[in-house]
Amino acid sequence: MEKLLEVKDLKVSFFTDLGETQAVKGAGFAIGEGDFFGIVGESGSGKSVTTKSILRLGPSNCKIMGGEILFRGEDILKKNEAELRGIRGGEIAMIFQDSLSALNPVYTVGNKMVELIRRHTNMNKKEAKARVLELLTAVGITDPEKAMNSYPHELSGGMRQRVMIAMAMSSDPKILIADEPTTALDVTIQAQILHLLLELQKKNNMSIILITHDLGVVAQTCKRVAVMCGGYVVEEGTVEEIFLHPGHPYTQALIASMPRVGGTFEQFLERDFSDGNGNLCPFLNRCKYADKTCEACLPKYYEASEGHRIFCHRREEKR
């Protein structure tokens, strides 16, 4: 696989009056052109912080402490703000979970989209307006003229998410990062948005990074997936490998905790609210396989098959 984006040993911390909190302790993954890549994990696993760090969108108390983020072989972390503007919202775009908060309440959809398009292109205002109508139509909005003249609060949740996707697509990005784009939507609208993302990905040969805690969404849409726990990617592979042959105990527990149609889930995955030890496996306190080796040092990645990596000491015993 030719790598379009590669994240290597990323470390991200937040600083408060109480000190430093490590949100991402060593995340790494790679995606190719036209890839549909999922990042799954519990709340607090570091998946959103990891992807926002790709565009350096963290708050003021967030600092990238180490690692590399290579886009077409160049490290994004070494670029200045002017260079980053050409990538952020251009070659790499992002849609967020809460579309109402992400849209400016004092701007109509059309005004905001025209501003965005003109920032990244040489279009005049008339051309940009025509492009807005084209984009809103492309994402399935039946009355694009009305939507263009509406304020965010006048649109439904599903319509706002379609607007967010249209805004992200306005610059023809090579990579679209979708941060839990369907979490706040009902099941019917969720299916429509996922179908739309799949259509756009195939039509534009665009790579998509989908962040979610929903394994069902991953199974439905993604080709490859990374499983995050406690700031680390503990397993990475194809969707088939992760679902049919999960190698890490955390991945196994996630899949086992999914409710089954006509039955109950196999086990309850308890939460661990402790900070843990950044130099040990993030699943150590909850793992039924943990032994003295696990308590001694951080595991290394083991390649179970080509492209299928497992972050565990005792991987062979659990397969």
Tell where the protein language model's regions lie, with residue ranges.
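P-loop NTP-binding/switch modules centered on Walker-like glycine-rich loops
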Residues: R56, I177, P181, L185-T264
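A short, flexible loop at the N-terminus of ABC-type nucleotide-binding domains that lies
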Residues: M1-L4, S13-G26, L57-K63, N80-E83, ...
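Short catalytic/signature loops enriched in Gly
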Residues: K3, T142-E145, E236-R319
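Conserved ABC transporter NBD signature motif
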Residues: I64-D75
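Conserved ABC ATPase "signature" region
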Residues: D75, K126-K146, I255
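Conserved ABC ATPase signature
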Residues: S150-L155, M159
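A short, proline-enriched helix->beta-strand linker immediately N-terminal to the Walker B motif
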Residues: S170-K174
